[in-house]
Swiss-Prot record:
Signal peptide: 1-18
Example GO molecular function: polygalacturonase activity
Gene giving rise to this polypeptide: PGU1
Listed GO CC annotations: extracellular region
Organism expressing this protein natively: Saccharomyces cerevisiae (strain ATCC 204508 / S288c) (Baker's yeast)
Catalytic activity entry: (1,4-alpha-D-galacturonosyl)n+m + H2O = (1,4-alpha-D-galacturonosyl)n + (1,4-alpha-D-galacturonosyl)m
UniProt protein name: Polygalacturonase
Any Pfam family hit: Glyco_hydro_28
GO biological process, one term: pectin catabolic process
Domain of life: Eukaryota
């Protein structure tokens, strides 16, 4: 005979088994295998703890349920393989990605570095983001990326804050093309309060709209860049703000580069209240002659730069550097004021500066 209590317990157990994971469920991924990842991804709170990702595999956190939180704890590492990556991929809406106190996401880049970047052995990109719906990525500690760090593509309404990217080891060990943030085909993205030590652009905005880069520190790389723009499927930058940033000991300070012979648009770009120091090549460089990672000396106007504001830019360049270089065509409606860069020398070959803009070399 089955008692009423037994029947109740059986019913509750069956309900628990049949009910999908609730918002309160937390799952932890640890160890050296991704075999349980498909199950972990169904949880609304995901902890990545002391994980070693197998060679040639992606920590695939794509397609997460809306509102999921991902927390990195301990040390995350990646076994070696020559491949394009990414090592981590995250997508979804209203996603929160956070770093716990004392954690590190270590790309162990020295295994791949050869001083050649894209021209050498195949190196994996580090973190690919496709996040929307007021998602947030905050407090991550990234160390020694093999290649580009954050690939921000097809994102919207995303805030990235308080990230530390430390690739200082690459300065002497062959790190190259270690961009901090690469932005493409994205809108309403805010990157703030981050610190980047690397060997390439601190940020490169290749396409997108309403991209804001504020209150960040950029060390040792190639500075803050719009572009290169041109030669891709999306060749429009409409709305970029770089405000209250510090660029230190970098090749360039502030840069816009468009591809020679290409078509596209760069408009509504604002560099405001940025400080530069220890710049090795150019304090400000705006060039329409970029091609195959070099400049040709001949600007073309297929990607015109319009509605450019350069305001309250201060600092210094090294003795062998140029303070400002401008080589463009078809540029319109520039407004420059409060640009005060000391050291170095002037660039004698500037051309294409819109009249009445206040810009000069």
């Amino acid at each position: 005979m089955i008692s009423a209590n037994s029947l109740l317990i059986s019913t509750l157990c069956a309900f628990a088994i049949a009910t999908p994971l609730s918002k309160r469920d937390s799952c932890t991924l640890t160890g050296s295998s991704l075999s349980s990842l498909s199950t972990v991804k169904k949880c609304s709170s995901i902890v990545i703890k002391d994980l070693t990702v197998p060679a040639g595999q992606t920590l695939d956190l794509t397609g997460l349920s809306s509102g999921t939180t991902v927390t990195f704890e301990g040390t995350t590492t990646f076994q070696y393989k020559e491949w394009s990556g990414p090592l981590i991929s995250i997508s979804g809406s209203k996603i929160s990605v956070v770093g716990a106190s004392g954690h590190t996401i270590d790309g162990q880049g020295a295994k791949w570095w050869d001083g050649l970047g894209d021209s050498g052995k195949v190196k994996p990109k580090f973190v690919k983001l496709a996040l929307t719906g007021t998602s947030k990525v905050t407090g991550l500690n990234i160390k020694n990326a093999p290649h580009q760090v954050f690939s921000i593509n097809k994102c919207s309404d995303l805030t990235i804050s308080d990230i530390t990217i430390d690739i200082r080891d690459g300065d002497s060990a062959g790190g190259h093309n270690t961009d901090g943030f690469d932005v493409g085909s994205s809108s309403n993205v805010l990157i703030q309060g981050c610190t980047v030590y690397n060997q390439d652009d601190c940020i490169a905005v290749n396409s997108g709209s309403t991209i804001k880069f504020m209150n960040n520190y950029c060390y040792n790389g190639h500075g803050i860049s719009v572009g290169s723009v041109g030669g891709r499927s999306d060749n429009t930058v409409n709305g970029f703000w770089a405000e209250n940033n510090h660029v230190i000991n970098s090749d360039n300070g502030l840069r816009i580069k468009t591809v020679e012979g290409a078509t596209g648009t760069v408009t509504n770009v604002n560099f405001i209240s940025n400080k530069i120091s220890g710049i090795k090549s150019y304090g400000i460089v705006i060039e329409g002659d970029y091609l195959n990672s070099k400049t040709t000396g001949t600007a073309t106007g297929g990607v015109p730069i319009s509605n450019l504001v350069m305001k309250d830019i201060t600092g210094s360049v090294n003795s062998t550097a140029k303070r400002v270089k401008i080589l463009v065509k078809n540029a319109t409606n520039w407004q420059w004021s409060g640009v005060s860069i000391t050291g170095g020398s002037s660039y004698s070959g500037c051309s294409g500066i819109p009249s009445g803009s206040g810009a000069s070399c």
